């Protein structure tokens, strides 16, 4: 079947949008929000139903929804596709919320990190919406934790008695406790010689 000649679209038109590596996806021609990056010449801002992601596509990759519903409107196991088919039928006016979330995230970063759990969830939502249809950047971007060394310091400090100021005495006490069967879970300095001694005793 021959492709239709590219045509003009206006904000609010419902279409199937084709991106490389994805099926023809239910989408809407979006209006540009104020302060947004202007699209390249002859490209339209597209809002994808189901994933709520955006992209800029030319008219050759857009197909009118009503005309192509029978051809491209079949359910698909791709994540977000079936939700998109439902949304384009039942809630075609759904708004893109990621732009507002990204704005809130950038303003909270300039104020300083508060460690608020609500901020973390909005960060993940903002990261999901950045790269267009299914290509999600840093979906778990904020979930990695930096190693904390304060817990080791505090455990060593708790072993010191208030009268001890000499580090040698403290280290000797720690070595004695580990070799005499002290709490091995807290002391990770078991050397290979300690392990060899234990192996020879059996």
UniProtKB/Swiss-Prot annotation:
Region forming the signal peptide: none
Cross-referenced InterPro entries: PWWP_dom (IPR000313)
Pfam families in alphabetical order: PWWP (PF00855)
Source superkingdom: Eukaryota
Record keywords, A-Z: Growth factor, Nucleus, Phosphoprotein
Ranges of compositional bias, category Basic and acidic residues: 168-177
Domain PWWP: 11-68
Predominant location category: nucleus
Subcellular location: Nucleus
Motif (Nuclear localization signal): 135-147
Cross-referenced SMART domains: PWWP
Phosphoserine: residues carrying this PTM: 121-122, 161
Location of region: Disordered: 90-202
Residues modified as Phosphothreonine: 110
Protein name (record): Hepatoma-derived growth factor-related protein 3
Species in which this protein is naturally found: Rattus norvegicus
Gene name as annotated: Hdgfl3
